[in-house]
Amino acid sequence: MRVLTIIPTYNEIESLPLTLGRLRDAVPESDVLVVDDASPDGTGDWADTRAAEDPSVHVLHRTTKDGLGGAYIAGFRWGLERGYDVLVEMDADGSHQPEQLPRLLEAVRTADLVIGSRRVPGGKMVNWPTSRKMISWAGSLYPRIMLGLNLTDITAGYRAYRADTLRAIDLDAIESKGYGFQVDMTFRTARLGKRIVEVPITFVERELGESKMSGGIVGEAVVNVTRWGLAARWEGLRARLGL
């Protein structure tokens, strides 16, 4: 099973060396693709140097910063073109524990999409205040209700996709740039009838660098989820009425 772990970066020079080192130690059989959006802090240059030393590390440079979704889609296309069997999403900031990747890879042997969940039994969040946990919970509950998805952590970004799952999705139709991208991909996977499994992970708040979350990203996600949910309900109503 050929595995590619995709790590999007923008100004992650403090975090990426630690995360990449841990990943190579924990799962040496996984190749790594760093997708850098022209980081002005030298992240891309550092990644190039590491790739020159390690043939399992690759770098994809993009000229503009156009969001998490665009970076992952570029990474998916790169990996699919090169015949990888499983494509993993992982944050550069250390929030996703590389040492827990084996449990995602084991689960994806019998699933189409595996989500590392903070909310299933055994999952947890570290260094998050209660207020942040409540906001995150609400952010996951809303799409769960609107889209009818029986999952605990729809917005989670630690994931493993089978290549066939990604090939079945029209990646050109993905609209979300920010964290709504995770909801978009989950919804499309579910509508294809694919098997989605959640496994527990420990999510640790970043200690280095700056978060990329913003009000605009949250707003985009809310608007899109509402639109998708209403459209799905309308489709269901038309089908029942024979329209």
From Swiss-Prot:
Family indicated by similarity: Belongs to the glycosyltransferase 2 family.
GO MF term list: all-trans-undecaprenyl-phosphate mannosyltransferase activity; dolichyl-phosphate beta-D-mannosyltransferase activity
GO-annotated biological processes: glycolipid biosynthetic process
Signal peptide feature range: none
Its job: Catalyzes the transfer of mannose from GDP-mannose to D-mannosyl-1-phosphoundecaprenol.
EC number of this enzyme: 2.4.1.54
Catalytic activity: di-trans,octa-cis-undecaprenyl phosphate + GDP-alpha-D-mannose = D-mannosyl di-trans,octa-cis-undecaprenyl phosphate + GDP
Record's GO cellular component terms: membrane
CDD domains per record: DPM1_like
Keyword annotations of the record: Glycosyltransferase, Transferase
Keyword flag Glycosyltransferase: yes
Top-level lineage group: Bacteria
Keyword Transferase: yes
Name the UniProt record assigns to this protein: Undecaprenyl-phosphate mannosyltransferase
